[in-house]
């Protein structure tokens, strides 16, 4: 689920792990979700939201695992906690405090969920990655994310893809299920349009305003029939159909579908496959502007390829 460490000398080796739905309500379950990734490397920093940081720290204490904790607005700027971190190699840090405390580069990072402001996540990854290249080392990233967090799943999948990490099957399936890219939706709409355009639609003669030629029963003085004269066909009564399912065949068994209904159907398909606007709230991740958060960010990376 990550890059092969033999293929590069520095950078990030990322893995994503599934968090069960119940993990959001139990302190012990929060700890159990990250237990297997603690202590695998010499130094580890657990990154989480402010409310979770205290709970995880208390759980570590109960497990007799000495650790440091970094929060925003610490009295001494976190000097004492930094000293403990150099000694024990394990720290719990809130997302808001990560940029303030200026911790040294760790061997591994555990993201327990993503920041509530998901825009901060790619910026944090870029900062860690930049330091890893500078120190010429591989840093391990473990991301524990809930399967119910649609936006977080989408952001994580793009970060894995952009760094050529293997995207787990369950992540890819969730992205397709919950966060189908707009390009796929537009492609589906075009396929529907092409399919409908290839189906011939019968057009009645009356619709073309054509007239039928019928022989006249009037005879001349000599008794010979007179030349036929064009007689307009009887005008058919228009039937207004509210739905395509109400259309019935004519006397010849043919169906005539009004053009307006075809256009209506295409427009309805547009609505059916258009992206859900409810997902595009103010908290949704802005992928196009993600590259501008850091002056050193490689603008060659794109989130939608």
Curated annotation (Swiss-Prot):
UniProt keyword annotation of Nucleus present: yes
Subcellular location: Nucleus
Polar residues biased stretches: 215-227
Disulfide bonds: none
Biased composition (Basic and acidic residues): 289-305
Stretch list, region Disordered: 211-233, 267-305
Biased composition range(s): Acidic residues: 268-287
Tissue and organ expression note: Expressed throughout the male and female germline.
GO biological process per UniProt: regulatory ncRNA-mediated gene silencing
Keyword terms, alphabetized: Nucleus, RNA-mediated gene silencing
GO cellular component: nucleus
Principal place of residence: nucleus
Gene disruption: observed consequences: Mortal germline (Mrt) phenotype in which there is a progressive decline in fertility with each generation at 25 degrees Celsius, and after 2 to 3 generations the brood size is 25% that of wild-type counterparts. Fertility in these mutants may be restored when transferred to a 20 degrees Celsius environment. Defective RNAi inheritance.
Record function comment: Plays a role in germline RNA interference (RNAi), and in particular is required for piwi-interacting RNA (piRNA) gene silencing. Facilitates the binding of the argonaut protein hrde-1 to small interfering RNAs (siRNAs) targets that are required for transgenerational epigenetic inheritance and germline immortality.
Name listed for the protein in its UniProt record: Protein hrde-2
